[in-house]
Amino acid sequence: VTTYMVRPARGVSVRVFNRHADDIARSLMAVSVFVQAPVPGTDTVGIVIPNHNREIVNFREIASTETFREASRKMALPLIVGKDTTGRPYIADLAKMPHLLVAGATGQGKSVCLNAMLTSLLLEKTPDELKLLLVDPKRVEMGMYEDESHLVHPVVKEVQDAKNALNWAVHEMDERYTRMSRLNTKNITGYNQRLASLQGKLPPDLEDLEPMPYIAIVIDELAALMLQCRKDV
């Protein structure tokens, strides 16, 4: 899509644009238009028009932008999602979500999107900073990651193994909450920063604590997994 930003003349209500959306689409020979009136934080109205020809979003191009480099400095787990309607790179922080569902019809690019986001994590985070738990019941989507040193476990391909892996993740989560409470911190970033500041000065009862990497759990075909073992996952 392409977004046009329009600043109404003084005295013109933004409601006018919604009322005349069909006329705008006809004048632009577009199938339809979406009117965002107003664009939050601005004095403009956004008119979003579907492009006749789709633009290919290049991963390398976005990964090379200053936008991604800056996001990587500020975000704990930067994900390259794509571009927004104005053509600017769209980067999201998985650590702030912290859950993400990628949905769509067959052949619409769900796996491409997922691989792009995984690649952006691997590009920026070392195995000491990030671990991955990959669940691939179809056995065909995540084989390329088999040799990655970021894996906390080989790619999980069996349903029973998936249940065990998720149970391990729940146990690990509880253990991490206990460790964070011992340092009076609320999240992984705060825990690691606090631990680093105490290096060489840790009291004896905290000497067993070690830095914690993030753990990202990625499940391909979640619906199929839930159909097979809904009660367990």
Language model segments and positions:
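P-loop NTPase motor-domain active sites and their immediate coupling elements
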Residues: 1, 11, 21, 42-91, ...
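Intein modules and their embedded homing endonuclease domains
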Residues: 1, 7-45
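Flexible beta-alpha connector loops of hexameric P-loop NTPases
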Residues: 9-13, 103-108, 148-167, 178, ...
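Alpha-helical transmembrane segments of multipass membrane proteins
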Residues: 120-121, 225
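P-loop NTPase switch/communication element
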Residues: 95, 122-160, 164-165
